[in-house]
From Swiss-Prot:
Transmembrane listed as a keyword: no
Annotated keywords: DNA-directed RNA polymerase, Nucleotidyltransferase, Transcription, Transferase
Originating species: Dehalococcoides mccartyi (strain CBDB1)
Protein's name in the database: DNA-directed RNA polymerase subunit alpha
GO molecular function: DNA binding; DNA-directed RNA polymerase activity; protein dimerization activity
Amino acid sequence: MSDLAIPTISCTESDGKYGRFVVEPLEKGFGTTMGNSLRRILLSYLDGVAITRVRIDGIQHEFCALPKAKEDTLDFLLNLKNIRVESLSGLEGILYLRASGSKVVTAADIEPSNDFEVVNPELYLLTLDSDDAVLNVELEVELGRGYRPPESAENTPIGTIPVDAIFTPIRKVNFTTEPMHVGRETSLERLVLEVWTDGTVEPATAVSRSADILVKQFASLVSHSKVVAEIEASEPVKYTIPEEKYNMPIEQLDLSVRAVNCLRHAGITTVGEVINRGTKELLTLRNFGLKSLTELEDRLKTIGLSLNPEDELFEEAENNKKKNKGIDED
């Protein structure tokens, strides 16, 4: 319907970790629909950064006692999980925490990195209670979304402690709807959306990314009808990928670490998902350039696949048409 109200969004309050947004005017019922959708995306599907593995000098597992510290290893790990990190490079990596002597250790004691920024340096981690105490810790940082339980200890080397990771940068989302009127139209409403983040992302940016995810999901439904119409109007071109190749993890393509990290950061984990994105969308991914694209195309060719199979098949079909036309004319 072309006469539906077209809303606008405004930020009425923001302090870096909290944002209040008003979307208006909306047709009656659209406030709940939009608010529910945004809330689910915000809480579950935004990319974030978290610590996934910890290595502490002299500690083999989480049940060991921490020498010359007030906290035990479990309490220390619980505190480490609350460290919020922003990835400046879009890549995964390692942070180092080193401290010595009698002191209170906070997240500010983590060594500075060109790739990461700790956004809550005031976070308390533990207390060393001896002048000759020494603490050396390696923190593995990964990109992901939502929540991920710790890896099985059987899959990690001795001395590496896996921890459950909370990747989502969103802490809380609330929304309410209020009735409103525009002129004589009284059946409209407004959506009031409140977003709390952990400081690694601005609330306005989080809302924008969530809306972008929704748009891309619904766009496939819109384009589906166009594709069907085009296929019905022309000679059908079919392309199928064997299931074992479609579900093949991207790691099996032997890509560079940089290319794999870029793809996983975008939520792409299988060969089928790579092909579904296509060349144009892949080039919009952060840190994924022409060099990575060329590398990916070469690896796909080795297993008999292509990034743009539909284009190749369409070109082949057109060439066949021309050949058949030439035969008929002869």
